[in-house]
Amino acid sequence: MSKNVYTFGFLIFIATMLVFFGVYFFGYNTNYFNTSMLLNAFLMPALYTLGAYFSVTTYKKEVKEIGFRDAFGRAFKPMFIGGFLSMFSIFAFLNYVDTDAKDLLNHQYVERQKTELENEYNKAKQILAKKEDKEELDKKYQERLQSFAPELVKDKDMFTFRNFTYFFAAVLVFYTILSTFFGTFFRNKTLE
């Protein structure tokens, strides 16, 4: 039985949403942002790679001869469909269904940035020997710390349509690179 690219794309979408709601229901805590980032960095690329792999191998078993363009398309289209539907659904959920989850993610993002700034400051302070350098570091640290003032971060929103568009553009680069790999690896080589 041959599955078309839309079927594989929809299966990738379903798997992505299962992961998203799994984290939402079971990981909605003080580490929600970090858990989401780890899954986006490690689990989701593996999931999309498997979806593309099964799409290409299923097609190759059916037709036997496959060129670069066919293999590329069979890898890219399911990832694009699954990714687009997932991005749209997650955007709609965070912006219209549960805005508290969006607020929590935004807050945890800002707190993470603040913690990283403090860690860098403490490391740099230990390394510097000259008093002038330490004073300059303290001055820059205090300036940067001002950007985390509550009135400046209260309207910070990482989940705008614009940011989702930028993120999806970056993900499309991943899809293109991965599809190029699949197209090169799974095409039939002909000797002329």
Regions found by a protein language model. Name each.
Residues 1-65:
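Transmembrane alpha-helical insertion/packing segments
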Residues 2, 60, 70, 174-192:
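Juxtamembrane interface at the cytosolic side of transmembrane helices
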Residues 15-23, 47-48, 82-90, 174, ...:
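Alpha-helical transmembrane segments of multipass membrane proteins
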Residues 26-34, 55-63, 93, 97-101, ...:
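Membrane-interfacial segments
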Residues 41, 57-61, 68-98:
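Hydrophobic secretory-pathway targeting helix
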Residues 89-131:
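Functional transmembrane-helix hotspots
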Residues 140-173:
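Individual transmembrane alpha-helix segments
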